[in-house]
Structure formats: structure tokens, C-alpha cells
Amino acid sequence: MTSSRPRLTSEPSDVPDGEQAQDPRTREEQAKNVCLRLLTVRARTRAELETQLTKRGYPDDVSARVLDRLTEVGLIDDEDFAEQWVRSRHLNAGKGKRALAVELRKKGVDDEVISSALADLDPAAERQRAEQLVRDKLRRERLDGTPENDVKVTRRLVGMLARRGYNQSMAYDVVSVELANERERRRV
């Protein structure tokens, strides 16, 4: 199936290719334009932008100067990016601390910045989000009261939380409590 939207490609002025981009100022201007275009789509880390510039063939010195300037004017801010990412992915995708740390590392965020961003995540809020995820899933589960079914449901729900980056002991505790609550709710 083909998309009706035109595919975005690099404009000729964005790609350095020997003759066209010999002047360092021109190269820097082109690299800056690439970064600005990428930043208009969504916030990005310095490492993500550096990767894009390298992929497009810009020399390291040009990339470093452009990225330093964008950082200096506040368009690149890994700390702010990490805080926004943690808040957004925790609330919208239900991710736990471990999964969030992995995602930020993949985006090239420094471990110290990751630790700082995750420190803002309240353990009570993390547990609350896990409880909500389990409650939402439990409403769709068939609970027949047999031990085999309970084990299967518990395993499935703990696995779901583990894949989202929640601590296994907390996940098991949340599932146990919410499973008991759901059984009680269905009895009434």
C-alpha cells in the first residue's frame, strides 16, 4: 500500500556533496537548517541531531559548531528533553523508571541527566499508574476463580508491567492487590 503523502527527502541544499558545500559557512548554514527542520517536528537530543548530521555527511567539526550554537541559544537542552520525555511517556504510555531509562539512553542522554529526570518521578505516582494499567487490563480478563486461571492472569499482568519497565516485586504486589479487588468487585 502506498501512501498518498509525499515522502520527505533531503533538499539538495541540505546535503553537502563536494562542489556544492565547499564553503564552511555554507556547510554550517545547511547543517543548522537540517537541525532546525528536525527540531520543528519534535524536541531532540544533541546525540540524535549529531547522528542525523553524520548520516547526511557533515564533518564532525561543522556538526560540533552548529550543535554548540543551538545549545547556547537554548534550542537543544537534554535536561529539559529528558524531563519532558519522562513525564509524557509515564503518563501516556504507562512506562516505568527502568523502561524510561532505557529509552533515554537510546536517545543519547547522559546517565546523570537520566537519573535527575527519573528522580522527579514520584514512587507513589509510579505505583498509581501501574495500578491503573492493571485495573484496565483486569476488566477485560475472564476470572473463573480457579487457581490455574489466577496464576495465568497474574503471570500475564506481571509480564505486562515488567515489559513497561516496572520493578518486578512492585508489579507482583500491585497485581495481587488489584486481582483481589477485582474479584471482590465482581462478587457484588
From Swiss-Prot:
This is Regulatory protein RecX. HAMAP family: RecX. It comes from Mycolicibacterium smegmatis (strain ATCC 700084 / mc(2)155). The gene is recX. It is found in: Cytoplasm. PANTHER family: REGULATORY PROTEIN RECX FAMILY PROTEIN. Transmembrane segments: none annotated. Modulates RecA activity. Gene3D superfamilies: Winged helix-like DNA-binding domain superfamily/Winged helix DNA-binding domain. Belongs to the RecX family. GO terms for cellular component: cytoplasm. GO terms for biological process: regulation of DNA repair. Keywords: Cytoplasm. The keyword DNA-binding does not apply.
